[in-house]
UniProtKB/Swiss-Prot annotation:
It comes from the Eukaryota. Anthrone oxygenase; part of the gene cluster that mediates the biosynthesis of the tetrahydroxanthone dimer neosartorin, which exhibits antibacterial activity. The two different monomeric units appear to be synthesized by the same set of enzymes, among which the Baeyer-Villiger monooxygenase nsrF is the key enzyme for the divergence of the biosynthetic routes. The pathway begins with the synthesis of atrochrysone thioester by the polyketide synthase nsrB. The atrochrysone carboxyl ACP thioesterase nsrC then breaks the thioester bond and releases the atrochrysone carboxylic acid from AacuL. The keyword Oxidoreductase applies. One of its GO terms (molecular function) is monooxygenase activity. The keyword Membrane applies. It is an enzyme of class 1 (oxidoreductase). The chain crosses the membrane at residues 17-37, 54-74, 86-106, 130-150. Glycans are attached at N109. Its main location: membrane. Keywords: Glycoprotein, Membrane, Monooxygenase, Oxidoreductase, Transmembrane, Transmembrane helix. This is Anthrone oxygenase nsrD. GO terms for cellular component: membrane.
């Protein structure tokens, strides 16, 4: 196996880890919050902290994963290999979660942050509905790096067969 094969595998693992980490927030953490928090402002505080830590780690991992896919694609293209384009598609698919966030998720995020900043007490039911909506949108966002990992894995398998 070549160095690029190891780097390709690293990109696939990184994208899979990113998707799994993101998915675990919607599949595990949000249900835990909903089951154990019975106060609207407290649920908003917990969601805001979850968002804070996620916004520190997840974008960095997304950029790193795209960078690794990009490195592999450029290496393949320089070597005149036809396997460069699947890695570009994997990078683009992984990065596509960013415009999805801007165009689809920001209104819900802004509403949750607005409620969090307000001094008045917020009804638990209102917050729960918004947090559940956010969780489902986050599931969809988590699929972008998963699809990128799938594309990268397919390219890696093709690479190993040649």
């Amino acid at each position: 196996m070549t160095k690029e094969t190891y780097v390709s595998a690293t990109a696939v693992v990184s994208g899979s880890f990113l998707s799994g980490s993101m998915m675990s927030l919607s599949a595990l953490v949000i249900p835990l919050f909903l089951d154990t928090i019975d106060d609207g402002p407290q649920l908003l505080r917990q969601w805001a902290r979850l968002y804070h830590y996620g916004s520190i780690y997840m974008p960095a991992l997304c950029v790193a994963t795209c960078g690794i896919y990009g490195y592999v694609a450029l290496s393949k293209r320089a070597a005149i290999s036809p396997l460069w384009s699947p890695y570009v598609l994997a990078a683009v698919s992984t990065l596509a979660m960013v415009p999805f966030t801007w165009w689809v998720m920001v209104p819900t995020n802004n509403t949750l942050f607005g409620l969090h900043r307000s001094a008045e007490s917020t009804e638990l039911g209102v917050v729960q509905v918004l947090v559940v909506k956010w969780a489902w949108l986050h599931v969809v966002r988590s699929l972008y790096p998963l699809f990128g990992a799938f594309l990268g894995f397919r390219a890696l398998i093709r690479e190993l067969r040649t």
